[in-house]
Amino acid sequence: MIVVTGIGIVSALGIGVQENYASLKSQKSGLDNIKNFQTTHNVPAGEVKYTNSQLKALLNLRESKTYSRTTLLGMLAAREAVQSANIGTGRVGLISATSVGGMDLTEVFYPSFEQGVTLDKVVHHDSADSTIHIAKDLKIEDFSTTISTA
């Protein structure tokens, strides 16, 4: 049996269910030019308006620790979902889905690959990495799995 008991959301419209709902009601668009990634393209996209450093601050995470953007966004949404569900400390599992995993860190790392740089950023590439960090953040020690949506 699957029971959905809470909701959390992070999107180009905002962070949290209330901010997203208010944005939808006021017909606000989340589309804008890309600002948080280096790109040669100047096209509108639905981008979460916070930098990774700002997301870490919202989550009270150490700035020096490396997390993929997928992990940071997932942590915010998952924390809200768990809080709205009022889940206790009983048997809790986590099913997380992602299409990009830690690709943002891999793309930054790749140009320096042939220069002998350490592989510490690449360990975050795997899709399951975000699920592992989210489960740890929520203190979920039971079942967890990752669905690749790519």
Regions inferred by a protein language model and the residue ranges of each:
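Conserved "HGTGT" condensation-loop signature of ketosynthase/thiolase-family condensing enzymes
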Residues: M1-S144
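Short beta->alpha junction loops
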Residues: T146-A150
